[in-house]
Amino acid sequence: MSSIDKTQRITQSDALPGRSTPMPVARLHVVHEHSMTHVPDHMSVAIFAMGCFWGVERLFWQQPGIYSTAAGYIGGYTPNPTYREVCSGQTDHAEAVRVVFDPAVISYDQLLQLFWENHDPAQGMRQGGDIGSQYRSAIYTLTPEQEQAAQESLQRFQQAMREKGDVRAISTEIVPAGPFYYAEDDHQQYLYKNPNGYCGLGGIGVCLPPPR
């Protein structure tokens, strides 16, 4: 039996079949006590992949203006995957966090700043000691405005890296969001339920310059 190289993206023909039944989702976010699925009319949604989603979700729920956060899977082929399937490298999904936010309190540009400054966006199919395509850096955009802001922020951060002497090319993927599949309940707000749990989040000491 051939082994799977988890640092390589797979094709759709090689992906696990998944299932038609969605993962059960808790009714309320355990930190904010808001709906895990509903998006109020005045709120917006952003989706980020920065490595293991446990620490990423906590980073965002701690910010002002955040209505809810959710850990999940996106960017692959397998419908309604399980955590075990994603970790196998056979779904092509990334671990990601869906952020519902109030743009009157915290802007998308501010979320992008948190994204760039709190992980290493130049590691390809890994994040620190977490190795595999599910740990890749990605921004999944939901509007043309998010796409433009994300692309412009990438250019600014790449330049800031060079000015710090880091000549690596950013590997962050910026693509329109496809289906977001909620992770199992054990993974939702994991570091609230397990305060001493693993968090692999960490930046590279570079700040995102503000938009011009």
Swiss-Prot record:
Annotated catalytic residues: C52
InterPro entries reported in the protein's UniProt record: Met_Sox_Rdtase_MsrA_dom, Met_Sox_Rdtase_MsrA_sf, MsrA_MetSO_reductase
Polar residues: bias regions: 1-14
One Gene Ontology cellular component: cytoplasm
Listed GO biological process terms: cellular response to oxidative stress; protein modification process
GO molecular function, one term: peptide-methionine (S)-S-oxide reductase activity
Enzyme class (EC, first level): oxidoreductase
Keyword Repeat applies: no
Region of interest (Disordered), ranges: 1-21
Reactions listed under catalytic activity: L-methionyl-[protein] + [thioredoxin]-disulfide + H2O = L-methionyl-(S)-S-oxide-[protein] + [thioredoxin]-dithiol; [thioredoxin]-disulfide + L-methionine + H2O = L-methionine (S)-S-oxide + [thioredoxin]-dithiol
A Pfam family that the UniProt record links to this protein: PMSR
Family membership noted in the UniProt record: Belongs to the MsrA Met sulfoxide reductase family.
NCBIfam families (UniProt xref): msrA
Functional description taken from the UniProt entry: Has an important function as a repair enzyme for proteins that have been inactivated by oxidation. Catalyzes the reversible oxidation-reduction of methionine sulfoxide in proteins to methionine.
Protein name, entry field: Peptide methionine sulfoxide reductase MsrA
Source organism of this protein record: Pectobacterium carotovorum subsp. carotovorum (strain PC1)
Gene encoding the protein: msrA
